[in-house]
Amino acid sequence: NDGFTELPELKAQTLGFRSYLKTSNYSKLTFEYHHISEYRRGGDRLNRPPHEADIAEQLNHSIDGGGLNYSLFTPDEKHRVNVYASAQHIGRDSYYGTEQNLNAYGETEDLTVVAGTQYIYSFDKCLFMPADLTAGIEYNYDNLRDEMKGYNRKTRQEVHTESAFLQNEWKNDRWSILVGGRLDKHNLIDHVIFSPRANLRFNPVRDVNLRLSYSSGFRAPQTYDEDLHVAAVGGEATMIRQAENLREEKSHSVSLSADMYRRFGAFQCNLLLEGFYTRLNHVFVLEEIGKDEEHNAVIKERRNGQGAEVAGVTVEGKVAYLSLVQLQAGVTWQKSHYTRPEKWSKDSSVPAEKRIFRTPDWYGYFTATYSPVKPLNIALSGTYTGSMIVQHMKGYIPKDIAVTTPDFFDMNLKISYDFSLYKFITLQLNAGIQNIFNAYQRDFDQGKERDSGYIYGPSMPRSYFAGAKLMF
């Protein structure tokens, strides 16, 4: 035990509500609000102010958000309208510092607003088949203010995105043909982005569903939440900044799937086979380029790489026996790589990598539930994460290296029992074990020269929990 944390100290409170008002037989107004207060602290000397620690990361979040949604449909259900608006404000006081730095405090404020409307018209027949026509518009606004005076970082970002979308889906019991597209104008991009999509479904028999899909999208060259994080590496702060003339990252995805259902007496079965391929153009990559002008922090720059490809196959199955037993499991094999090796370290002797970091070739999951009596539920679940490569920056170690991690199987058990207290009021008591086999990283860095980003695998070692939930 070196006195430094791998898991943060966490305190959180959440309060919220969701309700609705039926304004008529054919319309409804839904509204919700939530408040989240969260405190996180990691590093060493947790009982002292963060600037008295060798390494400290401390965050105080206050989050308020809410939304309104109004839906209306005609008695014949041919016309449907949905109007929505939501907003969220985040206030954050932070400390990201090393070596008892008094100037590593920061403040962040972020306001996000989304508003839009959607209209759907159902055709009894459109050209050759019944169809649903969907059209809509949406506006996104984000105002970010982030300041860390000790690192000379001052971010002022105002983002406006106006969007319009249109699609038509022809469908009957055997066929479904969807064609549509979306137009986005982002104020940090000098052109309108068109993102088409298409989907073809065919049911040769009732219980077999074949589907071919294409979709596209983009990531804007703006500051994201992960860019506001300051990592500690080798006793120094590490920050992310964007390269000049950074372009948007665009994706093109194709998938082909077969979804099959079958009943065997009291057993219900489902098997899904899917192949997928995604091409990323101007993919975002991070490369260490040295220190800032004041030599206060190491800089990693977000740049455009040439491209990347992700391709793989997923197999997923479900089995249910009455309401007594349910089992679901899936496994995915995929390859994720850049179209050419990308540099990630400023050390010229460190080779560029073609594989994308933190993308295992194999991963999977399973869930199993058993309810011998209605109030009792026994749930067993697990996730498998295959080997992958992660960045390990010098500090505790003498040189930047790409580490090949071991694989992990993380299994959990939860037992719950529901007690009916009064009419619609139920008390649930639960207990269980997380990470039963203690599949956990074994090679954490030690001391104040550590790389705080060198963490992989399951987020918790073996742990035990108990809880209570009141439902009404």
Language model segments and positions:
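Structural signature of Gram-negative outer-membrane beta-barrels, strongest in the C-terminal barrel
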Residues: S24, F128-D132, E138, E147-R279, ...
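Gram-negative outer-membrane beta-barrel transporters
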Residues: K171-S176, L271, F276-R279, A297-M393
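Short loop/turn motifs that connect adjacent beta-strands in outer-membrane beta-barrel proteins
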Residues: Y26, F73-R80, S122-D132, R174, ...
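Transmembrane beta-strands of outer-membrane beta-barrel pores
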Residues: H35-Y39, T74, A87-G91, Y121, ...
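C-terminal beta-signal and adjacent terminal beta-strands/loops
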Residues: N281-H282, Y384-M393, Y417-F472
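Outer-membrane beta-barrel transmembrane domain signature of Gram-negative proteins
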Residues: L59-G65, A87-I177, G305-A311
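Membrane-embedded beta-barrel scaffold of Gram-negative outer-membrane proteins
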Residues: R80-Y96, R211, N245-R303, E309-A311
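Flexible loop and strand-edge segments within Gram-negative outer membrane beta-barrel domains
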Residues: D2-T14, K22-H79, A87-D110
